[in-house]
Amino acid sequence: MKQNSLNGWFKSGAPGVWISGGAVSIAVIMTIGLLAVIAVRGLGHFWPADLIQANYTVPGQENHIVIGEVVQKEEVPRERLKSAGLPVPDQGPEFMTRELIKVGNRDLNGNDFTWIVGEWLKDQATPANLMTIERREWGNFYGTLVNVKQDGKVIAEGEAAWPELQARVERVNKLAAQLKNLEKTDIGAINSGLERIRLHGRKLELEGKLDATAQADMDSGRAELNNRYKDIEARLSDLHAQFNRDSLTARDGNGKELEISIGKVVHAYQPNAMGTLTKVGFYFSKVWEFLSDDPREANTEGGIFPAIFGTVMMTLIMAMIVTPFGVLAAVYLREYAKQNLLTRIIRIAVNNLAGVPAIVYGVFGLGFFVYVLGGSVDRLFFAEALPAPTFGTPGLLWASLTLALLAVPVVIVATEEGLARIPRTVREGSLALGATKAETLWKIVLPMASPAMMTGMILAVARAAGEVAPLMLVGVVKLAPSLPLDGNYPYLHLDQKIMHLGFHIYDVGFQSPNVEAARPLVYATALLLVLVIATLNLSAVWIRNHLREKYKALDS
C-alpha cells in the first residue's frame, strides 16, 4: 500500500514541483544574500564612525597614543602573531585579538591603516573633541583642533574655534564649486572655441583657401576668446587667493601639530559629539556626494558621477544601435529569407556568437572599429586634426558599437521567437483585406512582436552593461577629464573616452595603492552598478508590459 502511495506521489509530479520550488528558493536566497553583503559592506562606508583614543604599548617599546576608527576585529592564534615578529609572551591564551585601525594622517605616518594587538590597548576612550578632517589630498586627518587662522593670524581658538572652522569650511566648499564651474565650463568653452578655430584654419590651409580675409576672421575670433580668457583668469586668481586664505592648526594623538589649509578640507566633523539624527543627515549627504561628485586620490575617495554617466550613456547608445539592427536581421530571417540550409547555418552562427568570449569582441573592436574604420573616418573627415587621431582612437562610439556587436545575437533570437509566435491567420487576414506584405509587417506583425523586441533589448542591456574586458580596449579609462555630453559643440562627443562602473570596480579593487581604503568603495560601486542595470531593465520591462497589454486582443 505504501509502495502504491509512493508511486502515485511520484506520478503526480509533486517531487518535481518541490525540487523546482526549492531551487527557486535557493536562487532567491543567494541573490538576496549577495545583495545584502554588498549593501552592508558598501553603504556602511559613509556612516560617520566614532573615533577611539587609547594608549598603545608594545612590550619593550615606548607608549604612544592611537586615534582612529576601528575597522575590523579578528581573533588570531598567538603563534601567528609571534611568527610575524611581535613580542608576544610565551605564556597566555591561545588566541589574541587583532584590530585594524584607520589612523589616517598619511602625511605624518605614511599609512592610513595599521594592525594592532587589542590586548595592548589601554585606557580606551571616545572624547567628544576628537575630529575627522576629510581632505582633498592625503586622506583623513584625526586629532583635535587647536586654532583657526586667516592670512596666518589666529582668529579663533579654544571652544570658539570649532564653529568658526565650520563656517570657513562651508565658505571654501562654495568657492570650490565656483572654481570648478569656471575651470570646466567657462575655460572649457574657450579652449573648445580656440581648438575649432585652429582646426578651421588647418582645413582651409589644406584646401588652399586660407586667404587674408579668412586669416583676419580667425585672428579676430582668437583675440576675442583670449580677452575672455584674461577676464576669467583674473577671476580665477582672485578666487584662488580667497580659497587659500584660511588655515587651521590641528594636533595628533602624540602632540604633533600640523597646519592644514582649509582650502584642502572637504568636511570637518566630530563624530563622537554627533547625535543619531545628525549622523543620519551626514550619512545621506555623503551618499549624495558619492553619487554626484568627481573621484579624488586615485579614485579611492570622492564620488563616481563620471562613471555613472559614462555607463548609462554607453548603454543607451548601445541599445539604440543594437535594437534596430537586431530587429532587421530577425525580420529578414523569419519573414523574407527562404528556410533552407543557408538560413539554418546563419541561425546556428548567430546562436554561437552569443558564446564568444567578450575579450574577443574587444580585440575585434580595437582592430576593426578603432584602427580601420576610425582611421578611415579621420582621413576622410578630420584630416585637419591629423596626426592627432579623432575617431582613430578608443572612444564612446567604438565602445558602444563593440558592445552592440556582442549583444546583437540576443536581440535577433528574442525577436525571431516573438515573430514565430504570431498566428499565421493574422498575417493571412491582413493580406486578405488588401494590405501588402510590407504594410502587414509594419502595421500588424511588428507591433505584436514589440514585447519580444523589448525582451531582446532587456537581455542585451543586461549582457552588455556589466562587461569590462572589451571596454578596456575600446574606450574606457581610469579617469576621464570631461563628460562626453556638455555645452560645447557638437555637444555629444562620441570620440571621447569615458569612465565605466565595471572598470571602476576593477581599477579601485585591484589597481589601488591603498587597498583598505578602496575596499568599501568597491562594494558601494558594485551595488550602484547593480542598481543602474536594474533601473534600465525595469524601465524596459514596464514598456514591454505596456505594449503586451496594448496588443493582447490581437494575439487572441
Locations of the language-model features?
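Membrane-interfacial helix termini and adjacent extracytoplasmic/periplasmic loops
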Residues: 283-302, 337, 361-405, 475-477, ...
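Transmembrane alpha-helices
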Residues: 411-416, 423, 437-475
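Membrane-embedded alpha-helices of multi-pass transport/permease systems
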Residues: 324-329, 360-363, 398, 405-426, ...
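Transmembrane-helix boundary motif in ABC transporter permease subunits
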Residues: 318-350, 371, 540-549
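Membrane-topology segments of multi-pass transport proteins
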Residues: 1-21, 25-33, 39-299, 555-556
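Interhelical loop and adjacent transmembrane-helix boundary motif
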Residues: 298, 475-527
